[in-house]
Amino acid sequence: MNLLPFSCCFLLFSLLVGCDAESTPVASSVSPDPNDIITDVSSVLDTANVDGADGADGPDSETADPPKDEDAGSAAVDTDNPEDISTRPPVAATYDTFIGDWDMQPGQEITKCVLKRLENENEVWVTGITTDLGQGSHHVIVYRSAETEEKTEPFDCFPFLETLGGNTIPLMITQIPQETLEFPDGVAFKFEPNQMVRIEAHYLNYYPEDITAHADVSFHTIDAADVEAEANMLFYGTPDFNIPAGETYDTGWFFLDVWKEAKVFAITGHTHQYGTNVEIKHGLQNEDKIDIYPLDKPFYWDEAPLIQFDPPLSFENGEGFEYRCSWNNTGDKNVTFGESANQEMCFFWAYYYSAPSKGYRMCINPGDIYTQLGDQVCCPDNFLCSLIEEYLAGGGSF
């Protein structure tokens, strides 16, 4: 995947809004009173109850282990003309990895990450991801990464911090002890040989004794000959907001179109620590639309729900997504757009496939930041993408 258009759009954000906005520091990640932790976790789980989640100490779900065969190979795939598939293709191979282990005292809360290389010698097609979360897990996020150096020892990290630059693409977010995300039949993400992945684990020890944090992740692949369409991502949002200190705020409704050929099979929203909601609707601009996100699932910024669609959402000419983001700025400084933990974001990403395959797409609503750019800027579609590429190639000048 060519990440340059994505990075170009991030540069555009930086040029428009800068990256030096101030805000209050992130709250401490360690709670001094374990009893407070237990109360908070129970409240969250009782309120959320997303897809039957009971926390990492709940009863294990029954999941069949897919067969582990040899590498699926790198045969050429025709993703231009997907056909209806009557049966789900068999799993060709499974690639396992994990994050862990580290010890946690009662009441301790922390987020750690690893960067690891999978052992696929050839290009493979991933159609499902299974996670198995250990005791005390709050949630785990799995990314496809463009990094080249492994960091196999867990290190402290902050959720989603590196998604905007294009180096990490979220593939799965889960808070359930055992869960499998399956793409539609014959739809798969392409993994390059020895694909790098990033695993982010948020752990919370609400037990009276020490625990050992650990989570397993498995990627299930299908043969290249069974791939009918390549899965990819739509990354949509706006940097047009300035959240007043000590106040609630929302962006108002924005609209971004979607290719007519796209079939969206899952969607999730994204903010930073002050975010209270990302609302998304499906339909034509300036007409009545259907609410599709988050529906009856509560939105938590660090464990945003993933809504799946079966059948997938379809789009006619002029249709797309209408969305708005909301925040509660409990700090004492205004907060604007940025990638740091002390700034905010308003984004959502959608998993899709199409005929022909159109690849990764990122769209923004510039809003009042720079009205001359129009209602939306999309890369790689917009002429501005090539201008920014020229800017980069020129070392910061045209």
Q: Which residues are covered by each model-predicted region?
A:
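Beta-strand-centric surfaces of beta-sandwich/beta-rich domains
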Residues: 82-398
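Ser/Thr-rich, Pro/Gly/Ala-heavy low-complexity intrinsically disordered linkers and tails
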Residues: 19-87
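Sec-dependent bacterial lipoprotein signal peptides
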Residues: 1-17
